[in-house]
Structures are given as C-alpha cells and as structure tokens.
C-alpha cells in the first residue's frame, strides 16, 4: 500500500512528464525507491541551521549536502525580493476555475507539510501550480525566520520530486514558473552552485537573450541574479535595457521597487541610467500611496544607494506616507527609513510624533541598532524629543548589556548635543560609569572621546576618566596611523581640559599637553561653536550703534584666550561707562553678547544646544557678563526704536542711556 501511495504521489506530477521515471521505479522495492530519490536529489539540496556562521549538514544518503550562511547571499544588505506574496501574481495567470481554487486553497495552508500533503492529492500538477507550491513552502517557512528548510521537508519524496523535475527539464517551464521557482529556491537557501540552480539560471539567461519576457518576470529574475551574485552587471544591464523599453504605466508598485533595486545593484553606472532614473522618480510619485511598509523602506534605501537627492518631491511624498506606516514597520524596515531620512536630511513634525509613540511603546523590544538610528535621527536633525530620549534612557538603564560599546556611544551622544537630561539622569550616568569602568578598553578611541565630551556638555563631567584620555598612550591610539590628530578630536580634548579647569577644580590628574590643544573652537570643518547668524548680527549692529553712539564702542567676533569666539564684546570701566573696543586698560567688566540665531537651538524648540550652553557657562566662569540675544525675541521687535530699547534693557537695565533719534 505504501508503494502505491508513493507512486500515486509522483504520478500526479503529470505535466512534468514523470511517467518514464515511474516506470523505472515501478518494479523496485520501497526502500530502493527512497534510496534512488535521495541519492539523485541530495547533492543540490541545501539547508540552513540556526547557526551564526556557515554550516555543513550531512546525513546517511546525502554526502554532498552543503549550506552557506544566508547572509552571504544578500549583497545589498536588504530583503531579497520586493514582494514574496500570497501567490497572487500566479493566480492571475490561471484561467480555469479548478486552478483558481488550487491557489485559494494553497494560500490558506500554514505549513510545508500541509502544502506537500495537499499537492499529493492532485490528479495533475501543471508547472505553474508546482512553482506556486514551492513559493508557498517558501512563504510559510519564512514566517518562522530565515533558517531554511527542516530536514524532514528536504527528505520528503514529494518535495524532492518537485525539485528534480525543475532541474531536469527547465526548458519545458513557462516564464512565470521558471522565475518563480528560481525565486523560491533561492529563499529556501538551495546551494547557488548546485546543478538545480545553475540549470534554472542558465535557462533564464537563455530566454533573456531571446527577449519577450514579461515585466514582472524580468524584475524577479533581476533580483534573483543580484542575490546569487550571478553574472555581475552584464545580465542586469540586459534586463534594464529591456525594462527601459516598457511603459512604466504597466508596472505594478512591486515592479517599480524591483526596478530600483536592480539599478541599485549597478551603482557604478548610475550616471548612464540617470535619465531613466529621473523618469522612474517622476512616475513613482503616482504610486507612493499604494506602497506597503516593506516597499517604502526598500524604495528609500535604493534612493540612498543611488544618491537621488534631486528626487526631493518623491522623498517628501514618501515621508508623508511613512508616517502612517510607522506602527507597522519591522525593526529592519524602520532602521532603513531612518537611515534614508538621515541621509537626505528629511524630517517633519508628524513623523517625529509617530516615532515618539512607537519608541515610547516598544523601546524595550527594539533592536539596539534601531535605537541607535532613532537617536542619530534626533541628533542629526537637532530634534529634542523628550518622549524618545526618556524611553531610550530607560532602555539603556534596564538593558545595558544588549548594547555594544559603539552603540552606547551613539546612544549617549545626543543627550549632550541636545542639552537634555532625562528624569533618570542619575541612574543613567551611574550605569554608564559602571560600563566605562569595566569595558573602557573596548570602546573605539574616537567613540569614547565623543561619549565623554558629550557628558561634559551636560555638566556630567567624566572626572574618573580624564586622566586616562589625557595620557600619551590613549592619545596615540586616538591618532591611529594618521600623521597627526584630527582637528575635531583636538578640539574635544581641549574643551574637556577647559571644563576640568573651570568646572572641576578638584581634578588633580594629568593635563592635556599643549601640542594637542587648539587655539579656537570655531573652525570651518568641525566647529564646537555655531557661527553667528550674519543677517541677525547686522540687525543687532544697527541697534548697538544707535544705543552706544558709535561703532567703535563694540567689537565683533572676538577670539578669547580660552578658544571661544564672542559674537560682540563690550568693555566697561569701574563706573559702568562704555570703553572703546581698542582699550586695554581700566577694564572693569567685559560683556559678551551671544546673538543666538535658529541654528544654535534645537530645531523643534527654543532649547539651546549643548555646545552653546557650555560656551555660555564657561564664559561666565571666566568673568564675562553673558547677555543672550535670541532670534525669537529679536523677531518680535517692530521698529529700530524698539530694538534700541530692547538692547538697553538687556545691557544696561539699571542705567539711563540716550540714543540717536531715528
């Protein structure tokens, strides 16, 4: 009875022309049948076990059974295909009711065993249905993670018979069946060098050269070849050329994203394809509303890789639709969206609000790399989001062990940059200090310096670690193989040293050698100060000239001996009279005007950035009377007279000063 069942199952694959194979098996005992099938099929079947590195798996009938880590098959670091969906595209190609019923039943099956059991009951199995069965097996296995097929499925005679006919007679398959089978087998981690995949790829390339493949099949084939590292850009160029001849209006959203990903694989020829890319970018505006979260993240990633900064209308529209998908993105998809927004410098209030809700709700379950990208997004765009920062601080305190040294640095740096201390600041920095004590040498030198400098911006001075970073050994590590230490690192070291002198007088450790110090924190490439807003300065200068009577009574952009540049300096004598800016004697008080434009504040609030807060703090400790002139106060003044009165109140609140009439 068992032999009849096996023969029946194999016979029902009639469209694969299996009658001759059955005739040969007909007179053999059952154990011989299983032995023959296994010995023929096992050399090219491949399974991935849940191991972090490449593995090999052998069993009694499969001496050549071999698997590589699936990560090796993903050169672009993203999901392999733009859409591996519910067999819908195959169902569209089927005309008769019986076949449509097959696909409906297939889509309801939830395990590989159910799929194989179902197809074993079929009287006939056309190639499109066989390919659909493979694809459904792929889909249900992927739901449990990227781990390949279990041993019991690989050894199932129905599954082996399916694969055997795909290997033996690929020329008999339809275009859709061919590329669908190739797609599914790749996702099931069949060995790229197996005769099965080599035969399928060769047949695909042969049909590609002949032309006439449909758009969807070309897109699937292109992504398959990318995954296999097959044929380089030569075959992909042929696919791109054929797709260029098609009307974009006939492409589905999945096809458009696949096209982006194919172009993404040929970045060295992006200039040659730019005209085509411009056409795709413009057309994509019409399909954004139909993109799934996965497709949106893939399109954004492709735009980054292809450096499509000029496609800003598309980026803005994608950003608009990203907002509604924030709750539904996977960790990986959210990470890619954030990377794209960081790359293009895009942000908006609605996305930030959606991100706040997502992070606050699930921060403890977010992948560490996603948490770092969220913090980098806030840091790059200068977004002070208290819900996000508070949630991340709580996550770090509760789950410190899941973050690497590099990630800890990336996670903590925005707190200093945005000049914000969360409610659990004491627990946060106590936990950080413990990590630094135990893992100090595991931190990359530059990441460590950024981390400690960020703490100092927030008045959380890393006194216990200053002695270590000022030592020549650490400074040599920081310099690495370069001929000299970079300007930014020297500036951060200098500001840490200045903070130790001004704010930590009890620190008695090593000092920073003069050769590692900078003369000014205001440098063109990597400044620790924000240059004064030129338009705002000109407006204030007019008011000061009217208030003080002449231009000679104040000096602009004064570099102090302590590396800081003062926007405007005013000198007073002991009686409070204003001295000429050139005076060097009888100076009783120096006023430092900080003309703070929008770039000195967080982008979404009137909260001063960390680097400006430490500057004003240090100037006060150095004896300056710091007077802040923020842009939002200046913007409310309606006349020059109001400006002069405003400056008088700021500078000389207790004195009577006369100014010139307008």
Swiss-Prot record:
Alphabetized InterPro entries for the sequence: FAST_2 (IPR013579), FAST_kinase (IPR050870), FAST_Leu-rich (IPR010622), RAP (IPR013584)
Domains as described in the record: RAP domain is required for FASTKD3 function in mRNA stability and translation.
Domain RAP: 591-649
Entry's localization field: Mitochondrion
Family matches, as SMART domains: RAP (SM00952)
GO terms under biological process: mitochondrial cytochrome c oxidase assembly; mitochondrial RNA processing; positive regulation of mitochondrial translation; regulation of mitochondrial mRNA stability
Name the record gives this protein: FAST kinase domain-containing protein 3, mitochondrial
PANTHER family assigned to the protein according to its UniProt record, in alphabetical order: FAST KINASE DOMAIN-CONTAINING PROTEIN 3, MITOCHONDRIAL, FAST LEU-RICH DOMAIN-CONTAINING
Tissue: Expression detected in spleen, thymus, testis, ovary, colon, heart, smooth muscle, kidney, brain, lung, liver and white adipose tissue with highest expression in liver and thyroid.
Recorded family membership: Belongs to the FAST kinase family.
Keyword annotations of the record: Mitochondrion, Transit peptide
Record PROSITE patterns: RAP
GO cellular component: mitochondrial matrix; mitochondrion; nucleoplasm; ribonucleoprotein granule
Primary localization class, coarse: mitochondrion
Keyword Transit peptide: yes
Domain of life: Eukaryota
Function: Required for normal mitochondrial respiration. Increases steady-state levels and half-lives of a subset of mature mitochondrial mRNAs MT-ND2, MT-ND3, MT-CYTB, MT-CO2, and MT-ATP8/6. Promotes MT-CO1 mRNA translation and increases mitochondrial complex IV assembly and activity.
GO MF term list: RNA binding
């Amino acid at each position: 009875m068992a032999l009849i069942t096996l023969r029946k199952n194999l016979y029902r694959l009639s469209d694969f022309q299996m009658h001759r194979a059955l005739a040969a098996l007909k007179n053999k005992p059952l154990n011989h049948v299983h032995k023959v099938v296994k010995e023929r099929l096992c050399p090219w079947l491949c399974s991935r076990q849940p191991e972090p590195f490449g593995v090999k798996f052998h069993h009694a009938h499969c001496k050549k059974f071999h698997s590589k880590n699936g990560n090796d098959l993903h050169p672009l670091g993203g999901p392999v295909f733009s859409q591996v969906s519910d067999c819908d595209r195959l169902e569209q190609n089927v005309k008769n009711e019986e076949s449509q019923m097959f696909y409906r039943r297939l889509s309801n099956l939830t395990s590989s065993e159910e799929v194989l059991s179902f197809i074993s009951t079929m009287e006939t199995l056309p190639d499109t249905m066989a390919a659909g069965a493979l694809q459904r097996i792929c889909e249900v296995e992927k739901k449990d993670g990227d781990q390949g097929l279990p041993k019991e499925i690989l050894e199932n005679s129905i599954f082996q018979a399916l694969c055997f006919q795909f290997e033996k007679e690929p020329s008999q398959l339809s275009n859709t069946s061919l590329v669908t089978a190739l797609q599914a087998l790749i996702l099931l981690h069949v060995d790229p060098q197996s005769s099965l995949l080599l035969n399928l790829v060769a047949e695909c390339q042969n049909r590609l050269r002949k032309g006439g493949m449909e758009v969807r099949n070309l897109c699937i084939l292109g992504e398959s070849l990318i995954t296999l590292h097959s044929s380089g850009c030569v075959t992909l160029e042929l696919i791109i050329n054929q797709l260029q001849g098609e009307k974009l209006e006939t492409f589905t959203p999945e096809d458009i994203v696949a096209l982006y990903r194919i172009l993404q694989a040929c970045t060295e020829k992006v200039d040659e394809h730019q005209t085509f890319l411009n056409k795709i970018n413009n057309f994509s505006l019409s399909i954004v509303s139909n993109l799934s979260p996965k497709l949106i993240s893939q399109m954004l990633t492709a735009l980054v890789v292809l450096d499509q900064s000029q496609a800003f209308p598309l980026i803005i529209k994608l950003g608009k639709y990203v907002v509604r998908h924030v709750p539904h993105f996977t960790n990986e998809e959210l990470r890619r969206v954030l990377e794209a927004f960081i790359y293009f410098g895009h942000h908006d209030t609605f996305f930030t609000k959606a991100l706040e809700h997502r992070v606050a709700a699930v921060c403890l379950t977010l992948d560490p790399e996603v948490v770092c990208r969220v913090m980098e997004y806030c840091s790059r765009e200068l977004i002070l989001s208290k819900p996000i920062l508070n949630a991340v601080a709580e996550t770090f305190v509760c789950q410190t062990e899941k973050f690497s040294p590099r990630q800890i640095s990336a996670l903590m740096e925005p707190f200093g940059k945005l000049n914000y201390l969360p409610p659990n600041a004491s627990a946060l920095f106590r936990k950080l200090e413990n990590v630094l004590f135990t893992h100090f040498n595991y931190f990359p030198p530059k990441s460590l310096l950024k981390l400690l400098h960020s703490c100092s911006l927030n008045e959380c001075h890393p006194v216990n670690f200053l002695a270590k970073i000022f030592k020549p050994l650490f400074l040599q590590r920081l310099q690495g193989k370069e001929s000299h230490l970079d300007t930014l690192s020297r500036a951060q070291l200098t500001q840490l040293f200045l903070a130790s002198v001004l704010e930590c007088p009890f620190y008695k450790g090593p000092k920073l050698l003069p050769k590692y110090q900078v003369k000014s924190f205001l440098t063109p490439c990597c400044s620790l100060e924000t240059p004064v807003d030129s338009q705002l300065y000109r407006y204030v200068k007019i008011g000061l000239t009217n208030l003080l009577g002449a231009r000679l009574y104040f000096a602009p952009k004064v570099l102090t001996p302590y590396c800081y540049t003062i926007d405007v300096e005013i000198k007073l004598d002991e009686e409070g009279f204003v001295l000429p800016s050139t005076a060097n004697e009888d100076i009783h008080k120096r006023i430092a005007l900080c003309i703070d434009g929008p770039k000195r504040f967080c982008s979404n609030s009137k909260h001063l950035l960390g680097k400006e807060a430490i500057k004003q703090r240090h100037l006060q400790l150095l004896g300056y009377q710091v007077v802040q002139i923020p842009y939002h106060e200046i913007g409310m003044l309606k006349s020059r007279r109001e400006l002069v009165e405003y400056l008088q109140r700021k500078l000389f609140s207790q004195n009577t000063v006369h100014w010139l009439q307008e």
